[in-house]
Amino acid sequence: MIDLHAHILPNVDDGSNSLEDSLQMLLEAQEQGVTDIVLTPHHRRKFCKTKQELLAEFKSFCLEKEKRGLNVNLYLGQEIYIDSNYKSLVTSDKILTLCDSNYVLVEFDFVEEADITEVVYGLNKLGFKPIVAHFERYTYATIDMAKEVKSLGGLIQVNAQSLVGKGKFHFRKMTKALFKQNLVDFVASDMHLGRINCMKKAYAFVSKKYSKQTADNVFELNAKRFIKG
């Protein structure tokens, strides 16, 4: 499996506060059957490490991963919080796309309604492929909105915990509705320290309830569009 949304890089956001915690999270991912992870530290408010700082942290973490013999391929990106300045931000070379591709992982305010479709349209016009992170978690999200996101060239990611974890009922309901309408492009862990990695369980759930091909697509094959190496 390929996990394209994970906060495992240590000491850069709210995902992990130590190298040891991050290495343990990598081990757990490996045990879940994850072979490739895109590390996606936040770019929002107080979490605004520079591109150069993140690249340095990533290089160091990869070396530590090799020392521990962990067999997971690592890549770098960011989860970008969208505000009114998003166009100047994404074109400024200050943020990281996923695996140095034109795919960008974007998130919005969970409660205050954002114009997700307008942002998707704007990013697409700028030459980016926007992936809306954890679409099911936005309280104002609807199936019609998801359909419009897709029609405008956007992609939809949901969290594994929203399928099989102990998340809020709304998250589970929306995630299953998205699957029923064939609107999900990616399932990812959105791992933070303290969260249970349930990628294996979520894969089994999707494979059984929908189809193995659907599970293969959303847990691996679709992400191969931008994974390099």
Task: Enumerate the language-model features and the residues they cover.
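Mid-to-C-terminal alpha-helical segments outside catalytic/metal-binding sites
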Residues: 203-229
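Active-site beta-loop-alpha junctions enriched in small/polar residues
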Residues: 7-9, 42-43, 77-83, 109-111, ...
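Short acidic/histidine-rich active-site segments
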Residues: 183-199
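A general structural detector for well-ordered alpha-helical segments in enzyme core domains, enriched
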Residues: 21-25, 57-64, 119, 145, ...
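An N-terminally biased module of ancient metal coordination in phosphate/nucleic-acid-related enzymes
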Residues: 1-71
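Extended substrate/RNA-proximal surfaces in nucleic-acid metabolism proteins
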Residues: 48-157
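Non-catalytic positions within long, well-ordered alpha-helices that form the structural scaffold/packing
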Residues: 30, 124, 179-180
